[in-house]
């Protein structure tokens, strides 16, 4: 209740706050707090996709996700909001496909499914306007650009192009205005700037080299080497002749 009240107070202050339903039971609590505080909320729903994904963390999203509403639960939310005269409060559809999705085809399938659900909500009378794609944008750790767990067969530009194209095709076919698109691609943002922090276990120290002086009776070979050393300290040689020195 405190978290919901905080969000509603922020909305009263003029901030744009969207309360996203991740479980069916959350709707009654939100409506109760809204009625007590006299606030019409801005709502979103997290939808549980049926499209299959791939990758090491594929179990955290899609139809097997612990969070999100299936299609029947989503329609019950729509019916409840319609009965309360608050269907216009539903503004956003959100889903989370998983993390590190290596295949662009799986991402496109998920976007297409979610957009069709979005279009269906608009046809039911929901105001909508926002589509949150969640995470999934992969990082090619091995640089091989393959559809494996540690890689991806697409880049950021291809991801953006496929997402926008898929959304545009479905919405245009249904005659629905294009939504504002939100992504939560945290991995793709921070992975390139990772820092390894460890405790210092030990320190090796080295004494500086003792300054050596050229002795007066030094052999000619040593003198030649000394002169080369001194010349190299003055800077790069100007000609090829100055770069060569034959020592006997």
Question: For each of these PLM feature ranges, what is it?
Answer:
Residues 90, 99-248:
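C-terminal active-site-proximal or functional interface alpha/beta core segments in diverse enzymes
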């Amino acid at each position: 209740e405190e978290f919901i009240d905080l969000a509603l107070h922020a909305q009263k202050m003029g901030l744009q706050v969207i309360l996203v339903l991740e479980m069916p039971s959350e709707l009654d609590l939100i409506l109760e707090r809204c009625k007590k505080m006299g606030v019409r909320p801005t709502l979103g729903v997290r939808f549980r996709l049926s499209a299959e994904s791939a990758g090491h963390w594929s179990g955290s999203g899609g139809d097997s996700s612990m969070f999100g509403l299936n299609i029947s639960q989503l329609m019950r939310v729509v019916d409840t909001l319609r009965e309360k005269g608050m269907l216009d409060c539903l503004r956003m559809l959100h889903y989370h496909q998983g993390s590190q999705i290596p295949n662009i085809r799986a991402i496109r399938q998920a976007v297409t499914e979610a957009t069709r659900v979005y279009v269906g909500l608009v046809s039911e009378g929901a105001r909508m306007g926002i589509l949150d794609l969640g995470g999934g944008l992969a990082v090619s750790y091995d640089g091989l650009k393959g559809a494996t767990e540690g890689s991806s067969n697409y880049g950021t530009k291809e991801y953006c192009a496929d997402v926008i194209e898929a959304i545009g095709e479905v919405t245009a076919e249904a005659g629905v205005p294009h939504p504002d698109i939100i992504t939560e691609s945290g991995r793709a943002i921070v992975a390139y700037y990772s820092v390894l922090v460890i405790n210092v276990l030990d320190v090796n120290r080295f004494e500086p080299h003792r300054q050596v002086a050229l002795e007066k009776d030094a052999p000619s070979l040593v003198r030649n080497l000394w002169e080369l050393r001194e010349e190299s300290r003055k800077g790069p040689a100007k000609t090829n002749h100055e770069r060569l020195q034959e020592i006997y």
